């Protein structure tokens, strides 16, 4: 049975089947973030990590925007004080979450919203979605990773253009650049995100967590060290398995092999 919890303007809905949906719910302000919302968002992602009923998290925004950035009417409270605390930093908590995060992006993902999208593992965007970096326009120094992550995904030259001009990156262009996984028609982003989540949930969940971890950790290294990391973790994994675990793995593989392949993503 679906369960919905509302933490101020951050909604957490746990659905049957292992999917949780986190929604920024401030549509009249295009889901701009206050300091309190950031704290609640960080807590929501942190809670998902320890919740054994949740296997995949879908992250979205209500109304016609994913997130239009920080509420600049309360800029000082956002950028000063305990903003550096990792426990209340939503991007830090997203990066710490071991489970896959699928972003379902509708409308605007501006500056902080862009950075929240970058913290997702997989992105689905409606055709009208726009990603925009306005740090340079408003004199705000990036601190949630946009200046470093975007160039590693779409290339340095394109990232410089996006950040220095503050011009929007459309969903179609983002898809061609490999930043967005799937571009769908308006109103279809959540549906597609659920399809991807269901495909992930069909797999062996312990290995899903390990593969996400080794991919993300490997991205921080050069290729040679990343390949070494993979071998080390594979060796540790197989060396630590008991005969009973190997038997269960073989049973799982045999059971999966008897099923028809899933439809193409």
From Swiss-Prot:
Keywords, comma-separated and alphabetical: Acetylation, Fatty acid metabolism, Lipid metabolism, Lyase, Peroxisome
Q: Which domain of life is it from?
A: Eukaryota
Q: Which residues are involved in binding substrate?
A: 68-72, 112
Q: Report the catalytic activity.
A: a (3S)-3-hydroxyacyl-CoA = a (2E)-enoyl-CoA + H2O; a 4-saturated-(3S)-3-hydroxyacyl-CoA = a (3E)-enoyl-CoA + H2O
Positions bearing the site annotation: Important for catalytic activity? 135
- Residues that the record marks as modified (N-acetylmethionine) are 1
Which GO terms fall under biological process for this protein? fatty acid beta-oxidation
Query: Example GO molecular function term?
Result: enoyl-CoA hydratase activity
The UniProt entry's GO CC annotations, sorted and at most eight, read:
peroxisome
Localization recorded for this chain is: Peroxisome
- The EC designation for this entry is 4.2.1.17
- EC main group: lyase
UniProt entry tagged with the keyword Acetylation: yes
Where is the short sequence motif Microbody targeting signal located? 263-265
- Which family does the entry's similarity section mention? Belongs to the enoyl-CoA hydratase/isomerase family.
- Task of the protein: Straight-chain enoyl-CoA thioesters from C4 up to at least C16 are processed, although with decreasing catalytic rate.
Q: What is this protein called?
A: Probable enoyl-CoA hydratase 1, peroxisomal
């Amino acid at each position: 049975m679906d369960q919905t919890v509302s933490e101020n303007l951050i909604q957490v809905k746990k659905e049957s089947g292992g999917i949780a949906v986190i929604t920024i719910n401030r549509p009249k302000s295009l889901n701009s973030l206050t300091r309190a919302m950031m704290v609640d968002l960080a807590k929501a992602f942190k809670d998902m990590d320890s919740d054994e009923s949740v296997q995949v998290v879908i992250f979205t925004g209500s109304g016609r925007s994913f997130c239009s950035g920080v509420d600049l009417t309360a800029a000082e409270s956002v950028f000063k004080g305990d903003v550096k605390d990792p426990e209340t930093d939503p991007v830090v908590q997203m990066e710490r979450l071991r489970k896959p995060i699928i972003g379902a992006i509708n409308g605007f993902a501006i500056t902080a919203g862009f950075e929240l999208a970058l913290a997702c593992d997989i992105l689905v965007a409606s055709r009208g979605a726009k990603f925009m970096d306005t740090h340079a326009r408003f004199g705000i120094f990036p601190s949630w990773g946009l200046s470093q992550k975007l160039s590693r995904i779409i290339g340095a030259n394109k990232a410089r253009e996006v950040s220095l001009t503050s011009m929007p990156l459309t969903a179609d262009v983002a898809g061609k650049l490999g930043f967005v996984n799937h571009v769908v028609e308006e109103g279809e982003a959540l549906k597609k995100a659920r399809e991807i989540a269901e495909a992930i949930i069909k797999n062996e969940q312990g290995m899903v967590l390990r593969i996400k971890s080794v991919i993300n950790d490997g991205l921080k290294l050069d290729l040679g060290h990343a390949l070494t990391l993979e071998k080390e973790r594979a060796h540790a994994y197989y060396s630590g398995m008991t005969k009973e675990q190997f038997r269960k793995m073989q049973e799982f593989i045999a059971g999966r092999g008897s099923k028809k392949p899933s439809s193409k993503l």
